[in-house]
């Protein structure tokens, strides 16, 4: 999977290497502790400040990537002088970013920011769950594409 990411035309590995990013990560002791550091190293990031990257499944804090659960990485951002922080949930299907000042750039904004970049270069339709922000719909329509909302899978499975 990492090689597939590196092969994407939208990923400028040389620019990432040249930027000399200092990156903090919190992988909540999930499988993200394996793939996230490996991906960052493959992208040329040399300084990675790791929190909770042992994938044993014993979460050191509530794994929901919301500000009140991310105080440790927010503090690390300042101490390490990191440029950006990444936090994943246990199954690594959600990503939150932490800005250099320790403030969370929420997962909803992350999705919309990435979608805006991708759609600018490779137009296409988008889909997200019903609990997502309307901003993805708005960005998708900005590029003349169609947006669809889908039921939240876990909720549907429980019902």
Where are the model-predicted features located?
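Active-site flanking residues adjacent to catalytic metal/cofactor-binding acidic residues
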Residues: 25-28, 88-90, 128
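Gly/Ser/Thr-enriched, mixed-charge loops and adjacent short helices
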Residues: 1-80
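Short glycine/serine/threonine-rich phosphate/pyrophosphate-binding segments
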Residues: 30-35, 92-95, 136
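Short, high-confidence coil segments that cap the C-terminus of an alpha-helix
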Residues: 80-82, 123
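Hydrophobic "anchor" residues on beta-strands that sit immediately upstream
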Residues: 22, 85, 125
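Proline/glycine-rich low-complexity loops and linkers
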Residues: 1-8, 99-159
């Amino acid at each position: 999977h990492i090689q597939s990411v590196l092969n994407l035309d939208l990923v400028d590995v040389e620019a990432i290497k040249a930027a000399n990013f200092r990156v903090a990560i919190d992988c909540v002791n999930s499988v993200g502790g394996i793939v996230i550091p490996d991906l960052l190293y493959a992208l040329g990031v040399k300084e990675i400040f790791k929190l909770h990257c042992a994938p044993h499944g014993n979460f050191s804090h509530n794994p929901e990537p919301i500000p009140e659960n991310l105080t440790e990485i927010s503090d690390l951002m300042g101490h390490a002088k990191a440029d950006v922080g990444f936090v994943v949930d246990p199954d690594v299907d959600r990503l939150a970013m932490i800005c250099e000042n320790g403030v969370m750039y929420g997962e909803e904004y992350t999705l919309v920011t990435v979608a805006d970049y991708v759609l600018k270069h490779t137009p296409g339709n988008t889909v997200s769950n019903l609990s997502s922000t309307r901003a993805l719909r708005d960005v998708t329509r900005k590029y003349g594409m169609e947006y669809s909302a889908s039921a939240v899978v876990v909720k549907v499975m429980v019902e």
